[in-house]
Curated annotation (Swiss-Prot):
Residues 1-44 form the F-box domain. Keywords: Membrane, Transmembrane, Transmembrane helix. It comes from Arabidopsis thaliana (Mouse-ear cress). It comes from the Eukaryota. This is F-box only protein 12. CDD domains: F-box_AtFBW1-like. NCBIfam families: F_box_assoc_1. It holds the Pfam family FBA_3. InterPro entries: F-box-assoc_dom_typ3, F-box-assoc_interact_dom, F-box-like_dom_sf, F-box_dom. It is a single-pass membrane protein.
Length: 404
């Protein structure tokens, strides 16, 4: 009888690998590709990824984006930590393709992404402005993603306002900062757009916030104030939490952020990335300083953790390199597979024969590439499996000794 590893154990072992390693393993053979694209494996991998969310950092340089991810701090007793990160993947907008956008000569446009948790749909809200004012007399547009048809629909907004970029979507409602002008003058407000019903509302506020975040399921506005001396600390963090949407009723909280390290300095260049599932408010640098600092502040404990991230591959000259951080990043292969299927679906739906686009030489070259990858990866994959098996066996022995 042929000895083989149970498929459940294979799923268990490979789900512990990084996403990049899993993607490479898919190139080994058709059998491996079938295993690693199976629904059982993708769901198991997503479960493990949700248990270990990461911080995603996007680096923008010369029209090219690089994305890297680092672990989010787990040990709350550590006041500081150091991690080294290299780019997981790159993307570049080709210089041969130009983007044309028709807007008013003296205005601009704003677009926001929202999610409807009931129908599980993503929608894009697009607004053209004149002198940066979104008029109630002008059409706004909605694009529903994932339907297989990219078609904009017109909708109306009941009030004229001046939108800004601070935005967040919470429980199917898209919030963004704005100004509202009437006979009494100019006032601050939060525009509320229900993603499912596609209806607008607004909430009057006394401030414009540096950033909007999801604070335990509630809308929260945050402002930062820096110390005037060199170093920037302490940093005053003010929070306004929307406790009741109907009234509306806000609660204010003020904290003083400081670090004992004299090396860590900020120069009015912090951005609020969001709030993690564990309750930490994450602040990060807006530019690619060396080192790149990430701050994790827990309002309940009033503690601040400093994470120093060494970003590799940027070179010595880091001027004009922007950074954007996103919290609770998880890797999901089911989304990646859906994107690949969506990319290939238009030609298939039109019934076009794409076989003529590839010559026999290209096909042979692809086969050679697969064979090369298979030969190159077989060794590393085998080592990865052996390592995972050893790790599982070691944990089993430790537990066995502990029980005895």
């Amino acid at each position: 009888m042929k000895n083989s590893i149970p498929i459940d154990l294979i799923y268990e072992i490979l789900s512990r690998l990084p996403a990049k390693s899993v993607a490479r393993c898919r190139c080994v053979s058709k059998r491996w590709r079938s295993i690693l694209r199976h629904q059982v494996f993708t769901e198991l991998f997503l479960t493990r990824s949700n248990a270990r969310p990461r911080l995603l950092i996007g680096v923008q340089q010369d029209g090219e984006w690089s994305f890297l991810s680092t672990p989010q701090p787990q040990n709350r007793h550590e006041s500081s930590s150091l991690v080294v990160a290299a780019a997981d993947f790159h993307t570049k907008f080709s210089s041969g393709k130009s983007r044309h956008q028709c807007t008013y000569a003296s205005g601009g446009s704003y677009s926001y992404l929202g999610f409807d948790p009931i129908d599980k749909e993503f929608k894009v809200l697009f607004m053209d402005t004149c002198d940066f004012i979104a008029s109630k007399d002008e059409d706004h547009y909605i694009l529903t993603l994932g339907t297989g048809e990219l078609k904009w629909r017109k909708i109306q907004c009941p009030f004229t306002h001046e939108p800004f970029w601070e935005r967040i979507c919470i429980n199917g409602v898209l919030y963004y900062s704005a100004y509202y002008s009437d006979s009494n003058g100019r006032s601050h407000l939060i525009a509320c757009f229900d993603v499912r019903s596609e209806k607008f509302n607004f909430i009057a506020t006394k401030h414009r916030y540096d950033q909007l975040i999801n604070y335990k399921g509630k809308l929260c506005g945050i402002n930062l104030e820096y110390a005037r001396h060199v170093g920037g600390f302490p940093v005053k963090l003010s929070m306004w939490v929307l406790e009741d949407v109907e009234k509306p009723e806000w609660s204010k909280h003020v904290y003083s952020l400081w670090t004992e390290s004299e090396v860590v300095k900020v120069n009015r260049n912090l951005s609020v990335s969001g709030m993690t599932a564990t309750g930490d408010i994450v602040l990060s640098m807006e530019d690619a300083t060396n080192p790149f600092y990430v701050f994790n502040f827990n309002p309940d404990r009033n503690t601040l953790q400093v994470q120093s991230v060494e970003i590799q591959g940027l070179g010595a000259n880091r001027d004009h390199i922007a950074c954007h951080a996103f919290v609770d990043y998880v890797e999901d292969f089911s989304v990646s597979d859906a994107v690949l299927q969506l990319k290939s679906s238009p030609l298939q739906q039109q019934g076009q024969d794409t076989s003529h686009d590839l010559s026999k030489s290209v096909k042979n070259k692809q086969l050679d590439n697969y064979e090369f990858l298979a030969n190159k990866l077989n060794h590393s994959v085998s080592l990865a499996i052996l390592f995972c098996l050893f790790f599982l066996l070691f944990n089993y022995l430790i537990r066995l000794c502990w029980v005895r």
